[in-house]
């Protein structure tokens, strides 16, 4: 328990420090590092399912996307995604031993981790960007904490017993309320130009994205026959285990914030 707590404290302090003081390039560097570590674990799991992704190519793309986003914004991210698809097609055509499943796994891994996480960098570039990235991270933590506290005490109705037996609908509702509370604070304090109704909607959508990311990774691990994505974080498993809920949150929060008037 002490090891788990210490690991969580170090991870949290590094994350908060970079978000608040690291500016856009600092956040891009952290996202790239987390993405590469998570990508290594993702590709290792898929290899257990008899797939052969191009890990070197995939990890280079995951590392490059946050920096392309930091320098050129959305155009940089879309350009990096386009380059990824074109390079994957060339790789598939030139090497006859490469199967469609290998190419698809490589492209999906980069899109799932590198492209999605890079939206945190886009968030950082908005007005009140540091606060919005912090809200995205804290909303995931709030979702986890509220879902655990309620689910472990009064949770009776299983949400996805075949994928994540400990998740309950009661915990899901509590986690959603915790996430919504975070975005109400954003509406009340940050100058992001949101209405209360839009902030509530973002909170609900972010909660769904957080749980979806968690369940997807749980399904991925079950298919690969592993309990944890890795062993590098004592008491927490791997890096993908730590950021699975955050991966889709940045995407959902960014586009809903833009639609709600943030700039």
Can you describe what each PLM-predicted range is?
Residues 147-148, 152, 218-226:
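Juxtamembrane interface at the ends
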Residues 12, 179-180, 242-245, 249, ...:
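Hydrophobic transmembrane alpha-helices of multi-pass small-molecule transporters
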Residues 143-146, 173, 240-250:
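Membrane-embedded alpha-helical segments of transport systems
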Residues 1-208:
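Membrane-embedded alpha-helical bundles of polytopic integral membrane proteins
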Residues 222-246:
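Interfacial loop-to-transmembrane junctions
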Residues 255-263:
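Juxtamembrane boundary at the C-terminal end of a transmembrane helix
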């Amino acid at each position: 328990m002490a090891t788990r707590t210490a690991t969580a404290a170090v991870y949290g302090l590094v994350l908060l420090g970079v978000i608040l003081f690291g500016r856009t390039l600092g956040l891009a560097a952290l996202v790239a590092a987390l993405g590469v570590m998570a990508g290594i674990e993702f590709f290792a799991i898929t290899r257990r399912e008899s797939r052969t992704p191009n890990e070197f190519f995939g990890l280079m793309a995951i590392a490059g996307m946050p920096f392309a986003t930091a320098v050129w914004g959305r155009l940089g991210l879309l350009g990096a995604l386009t380059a990824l698809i074109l390079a994957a097609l060339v790789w598939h055509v030139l090497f006859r031993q490469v199967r469609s499943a290998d190419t698809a796994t490589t492209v999906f891994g980069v899109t799932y981790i590198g492209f999605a996480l890079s939206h945190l960098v886009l968030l950082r570039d908005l007005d009140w960007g540091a606060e919005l990235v912090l809200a995205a991270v804290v909303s995931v933590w709030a979702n986890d904490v509220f879902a655990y506290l309620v689910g472990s005490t009064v949770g009776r109705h299983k949400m996805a017993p075949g994928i994540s037996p400990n998740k309950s609908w009661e915990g899901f509702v509590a986690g959603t309320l915790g996430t919504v509370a975070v975005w109400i604070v954003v509406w009340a304090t940050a100058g992001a130009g949101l209405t209360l109704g839009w902030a509530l909607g973002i909170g609900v959508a972010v909660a769904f994205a957080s749980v979806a990311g968690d369940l997807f990774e749980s399904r991925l691990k079950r298919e690969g026959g592993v309990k944890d994505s890795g062993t590098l974080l004592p008491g927490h498993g791997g890096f993908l285990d730590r950021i699975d809920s955050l991966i889709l949150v940045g995407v959902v929060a960014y586009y809903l914030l833009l639609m709600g008037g943030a700039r």
